[in-house]
Amino acid sequence: MVNLANVPTDSQFQSRTTYRIRNKVIYCLDGARIGIQYETFFAGEPCEIYHCVLESKSFLEKMTVTEHTLPFFLPIREVETEHLSSNAIRFIDHLEEILQSYIDRREQVRLIKELYGNQIGELFHSLPYTLIEFTLEDFECKVTVSIRYSDLILTLPSQARVLAWPLRSAKRISAADRRAQPVPSRLSYAESALKTLSLPEAYAEIVLELPRALKQMFYSQESD
């Protein structure tokens, strides 16, 4: 659903020469100024619209960002320093990548909460959704999931860590093991799923295979 709060209403964006390139619209504004409107989507449905205005004091000077509606935690100034002085097109395109990837990560988290909220315990994420952690507690083990994205343009994690912690009340755990400090087991299949599938798809895969993985884990512990 479109968030109209980020749609520019200033008259400077009305009745101007525009160019549409994929999911962005470029406006020719007064003077040496350019307005860019970024349209974001998830699963084919429109999400937020953001805008950014670039200006140059003269045609000989480099452009700078004079206003924008991007989330404050996205590093627009760093992107400006890195790209805008040398390549305005690269700056515009890279900002589009950052915005769309942020929306993808955010909406993936929203979707697993919507679909599987009754199975998810604690859930934490950083503001740009580059760190996501949650627990699954509706099983014989407490499963902790931690995923990280090393770059703001990634929609699949660069790192994934999934650990199964035996619950002391689990039927298969012996009395001696209940008294001992629980030792977690890594769920490699779950880590692989998180790195190759979208978060909702990976979650479904993890839950589907979890009983078999836990059975193997308990069998391995009992045979040691």
What is the role of each PLM region?
Residues 5-224:
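Charged, low-complexity assembly regions of eukaryotic complex subunits
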